[in-house]
Amino acid sequence: MVLSAADKTNVKGIFSKIGGHAEEYGAETLERMFITYPQTKTYFPHFDLQHGSAQIKAHGKKVAAALVEAVNHIDDIAGALSKLSDLHAQKLRVDPVNFRFLGHCFLVVLAIHHPSALTPEVHASLDKFMCAVGATLTAKYR
């Protein structure tokens, strides 16, 4: 998915609002995904999946950090997430549909915390960005 200059500006703008909330938003995203799409729990059999668990917070922080890394390298998302793509494709073998679930839940979390910032245009740009991230993470599955 090709991101326009406006999309890149929109994505960078909303991510600037995340600031010190990366762990919180990442954990909320995972919790929401586990509740909404319970089949995603199968990839985390060793995790305490209760609200507020240290494991969810830690992994949420990793998820958010990867998204921030993708934003910081928005013109080379594939390069920025190459190692993560290898991990998910070759070792973890995560079903590609789960990246869409994660992206949707992340959009919902941002909408909850920043309702006025998530205009239809920003929403569309974030959706395109999350699709690009998902495509990058599944590119090495082939």
From Swiss-Prot:
Example GO biological process: oxygen transport
Globin domain span: 2-142
Gene Ontology cellular-component terms listed: blood microparticle; haptoglobin-hemoglobin complex; hemoglobin complex
Keywords recorded for this protein, A-Z: Heme, Iron, Metal-binding, Oxygen transport, Transport
Binding site for O2: 59
Gene Ontology MF terms: haptoglobin binding; heme binding; iron ion binding; organic acid binding; oxygen binding; oxygen carrier activity; peroxidase activity
UniProt tissue specificity: Red blood cells.
Domain of life: Eukaryota
Residues that bind heme b: 88
InterPro entries hit by this protein: Globin (IPR000971), Globin-like_sf (IPR009050), Globin/Proto (IPR012292), Hemoglobin_a-typ (IPR002338), Hemoglobin_oxygen_transport (IPR050056), Hemoglobin_pi (IPR002339)
Additional comment: This alpha chain is from the adult major tetrameric component, which has been called hemoglobin A or AII.
Record's function text: Involved in oxygen transport from the lung to the various peripheral tissues.
Subunit composition and interactions: Heterotetramer of two alpha chains and two beta chains.
Record family assignment: Belongs to the globin family.
Protein name: Hemoglobin subunit alpha-A
Source organism of this protein record: Aythya fuligula
